[in-house]
């Protein structure tokens, strides 16, 4: 059933020891065998049970419910398991508060007090008048939901093992050395205390001194000395120690201190270990000071610069936002703008904010664009009339005069605004790894892309590639029309150059293109294609040019110019009578253009109306004389060719025809 007993015992050894002590305090003794059997059943039917164990009563109630469900399904649950489960649940009930949580400090204190009583009874039997006092101290949170079980093992489990005869070897005072004192700062050296009263034990256990290693989250760090006359952290109240005094007798930790926390906690701890006492002490806040003696009316009040730390939650949100959405996502831009305009950030603050949020490659880009923007701003300051006395060292927070925070805190508002604009501009130019910034000329609207999406992409690319705001606005307005698809261009064309002053050109373009590409627009285009009507209301029946007038939209036969000429000719010809007989047929008084006669007055056919005869075959001509074909056997009967031509020439109609040369030669 599940894992073997040896594995269960080794896995839950520390927790089993604690449960036995807890039950022993309540007057109940449970054998280790029965507890191992209980945890075997829990391991089988409750796989969610933590390896470190739990003191929460809700978890043990949940174990009971799941064991009941397993029993209803036919699984056999031994009776001893039910008894042990009920005993443990009853033992945990007194430790529950109104919030159903376990006060671990109370549990530890009560258990250690029981150990104290048992030890006192044993010591009184051997030596009289000797006793040992244990002082319990809360070292963890009040709720078991936030209990660090690693710390729980460090404090309790060695003591329980010692009570069972398997405790760790104790180190004498001469051999005890603070753990890690060679490489830890003063605020993190483990506390080593001597016992208040020496305990005479047997010869195998001489008087000892134990080390107490507080967790990293609870270690006390002295407030850093500030350069400005005020501490960076509030000092501890007078009359008590900055951290609760450790007990007079502590146990050697079985594991190194837990380093739980986010990356931000590690950065803060690292900066403090390196001696950076001013880490995370930003931004600067200006507070008016009360007027001093001799102050005149109307004199501006004196202002004192102070630091106020950002919350850890805000810095964590910045880091997670950059990691999930990217440094230039709409969420990150909005968050960064609110931070930049809501606080008085100096160059040191911008550098710390970028280091904590950006990756190394992104921070390198930010620093590069920051320096580039500073050089451009310095040129503008020098060219201004009058020149602005703000140099590059002040905008970068470097040099002899601006390298410290106290010097940067005295920067003028104009310099703070310039640093803000430069850093925001540099942040916008940060690119994600593997991505490139395209040219604004290559940003074109797709055939099915909404016009607002196209304009948003165009503005984003122009903002990254064009520094001057006026030039960027002109380029965006131009490319919003030139790079749009034909449908949006036809809708924008009537507005181009006619937008009234004071109105946003891009907003008017977006209004004009509203609905293009949708179902209504497609239906309208289909209806216009069927009826031959376009948006302008023109009729399109022919796409070519007229051969008469050269205009587009009609054929020559429908040309209005030609029809107008025909009407004019008819009006001019039919309005008067012909002066004489028809010059063509000579038979009537009508115009020659209106003559339809086929014969003239003499009966001769007129040209153009005579019927043509049958077409004749073309005559063959060549360099050789034509020899008629004569079949064999008829050559003697055929007369010579010369006689044939002589007979033909005697005919009256062929008297003038000369004989062929071949016939003459014969």
Curated annotation (Swiss-Prot):
Zinc finger spans (CCHC-type) are: 544-561, 580-597
Q: Where is the composition biased (Polar residues)?
A: 604-622
> Locations of Pro residues compositional bias?
232-247
Spans annotated as Disordered: 165-205, 217-264, 598-641
Lipid-modified sites (N-myristoyl glycine): 2
Q: What membrane topology is given? A: Lipid-anchor
Of the GO CC terms on this record, one is:
plasma membrane
Q: Which GO terms describe its biological process?
A: viral process
Query: What SMART domains is this protein classified in?
Result: ZnF_C2HC
Which keywords, in A-to-Z order, does the entry hold?
A: Cell membrane, ERV, Lipoprotein, Membrane, Metal-binding, Myristate, Repeat, Transposable element, Zinc, Zinc-finger
The domain comment in this protein's record states: HERV-K Gag polyprotein contains regions homologous to the matrix (MA), capsid (CA) and nucleocapsid (NC) proteins from infectious retroviruses. Evidence suggests that HERV-K(HML-2) Gag polyprotein can be cleaved into mature MA, CA and NC under certain circumstances. However, the exact boundaries as well as the size of processed Gag proteins have not been precisely determined yet.
Q: Which family does it belong to?
A: Belongs to the beta type-B retroviral Gag protein family. HERV class-II K(HML-2) gag subfamily.
Entry protein name:
Endogenous retrovirus group K member 7 Gag polyprotein
């Amino acid at each position: 059933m599940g894992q073997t007993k040896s594995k269960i015992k080794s896995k839950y050894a520390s927790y089993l020891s604690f449960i036995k002590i807890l039950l022993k305090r309540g007057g109940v003794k449970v054998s280790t065998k029965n507890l191992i059997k209980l945890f075997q059943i829990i391991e089988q039917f409750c796989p969610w049970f933590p390896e470190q164990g739990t003191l929460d009563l809700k978890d043990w109630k949940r174990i009971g419910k799941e064991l009941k469900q397993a029993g209803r399904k036919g699984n056999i649950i031994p009776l001893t398991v039910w008894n042990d489960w009920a005993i443990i649940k009853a033992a945990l009930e007194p430790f529950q508060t109104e919030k159903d949580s376990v006060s671990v400090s109370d549990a530890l204190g009560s258990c250690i007090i029981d150990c104290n009583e048992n030890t006192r009874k044993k010591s009184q039997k051997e030596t009289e008048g000797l006793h040992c006092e244990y002082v319990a101290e809360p070292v963890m949170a009040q709720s078991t939901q936030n209990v660090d079980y690693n710390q729980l093992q460090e404090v309790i489990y060695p003591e329980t093992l010692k009570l069972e005869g398997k405790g760790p070897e104790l180190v004498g005072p001469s051999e005890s050395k603070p753990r890690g004192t060679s490489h830890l700062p003063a605020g993190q050296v483990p506390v080593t205390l001597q016992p208040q009263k020496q305990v005479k034990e047997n010869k195998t256990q001489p008087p000892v001194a134990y080390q107490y290693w507080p967790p990293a989250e609870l270690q006390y760090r002295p407030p850093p000395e500030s350069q400005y006359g005020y501490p960076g952290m509030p000092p501890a109240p007078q009359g008590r120690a900055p951290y609760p005094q450790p007990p007079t007798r502590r146990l050697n930790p079985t594991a190194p201190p837990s380093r739980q926390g986010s990356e931000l906690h590690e950065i803060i701890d690292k900066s403090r270990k390196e001696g950076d006492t001013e880490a995370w002490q930003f931004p600067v806040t200006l507070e008016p000071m009360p007027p001093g003696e001799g102050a005149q009316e109307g004199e501006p009040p004196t202002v004192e610069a102070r630091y106020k730390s950002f919350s850890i939650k805000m810095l964590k949100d910045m880091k997670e936002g950059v990691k999930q959405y990217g440094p230039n996502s709409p969420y990150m831009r909005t968050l960064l703008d609110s931070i930049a305009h809501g606080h008085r950030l100096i160059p040191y603050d911008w550098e710390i904010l970028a280091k904590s949020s950006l990756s190394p490659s992104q921070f390198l880009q930010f620093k590069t664009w920051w320096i580039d923007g500073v050089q451009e701003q310095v040129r503008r300051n020098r060219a201004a009339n009058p020149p602005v006395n703000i140099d590059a060292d002040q905008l970068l927070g470097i040099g002899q005069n601006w390298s410290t925070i106290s010097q940067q805190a005295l920067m003028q508002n104009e310099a703070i605004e310039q640093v803000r604009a430069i850093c925001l501009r540099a942040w916008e130019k940060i690119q994600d790894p593997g991505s490139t910034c395209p040219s604004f000329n290559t940003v074109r609207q797709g055939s099915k892309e909404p016009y607002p999406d196209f304009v948003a992409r165009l503005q984003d690319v122009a903002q990254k590639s064009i520094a001057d705001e006026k030039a960027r606005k002109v380029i965006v307005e131009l490319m919003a029309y030139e790079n749009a698809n034909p449908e949006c261009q036809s809708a924008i064309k009537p507005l181009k150059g006619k937008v009234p002053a004071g109105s946003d050109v891009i907003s008017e373009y977006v209004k004009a293109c509203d609905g293009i590409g949708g179902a209504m627009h497609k239906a309208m285009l289909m209806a216009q294609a069927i009826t031959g009507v376009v948006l302008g209301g023109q009729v399109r029946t022919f796409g070519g040019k007229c051969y008469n007038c050269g205009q587009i939209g009609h054929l020559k036969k429908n040309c209005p110019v030609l029809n107008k000429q025909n009407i004019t000719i008819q009006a001019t010809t039919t309005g008067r009578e012909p002066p004489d007989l028809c010059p063509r047929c000579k038979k009537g008084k009508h115009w020659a253009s209106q003559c339809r006669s086929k014969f003239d007055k003499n009966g001769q056919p007129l040209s153009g109306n005579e019927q043509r005869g049958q077409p004749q075959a073309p005559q063959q001509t060549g360099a050789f004389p034509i020899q008629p074909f004569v079949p064999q056997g008829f050559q003697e009967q055929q007369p010579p060719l010369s006689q044939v031509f002589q007979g033909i020439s005697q005919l009256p109609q062929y008297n003038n025809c000369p004989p062929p040369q071949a016939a003459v030669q014969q």
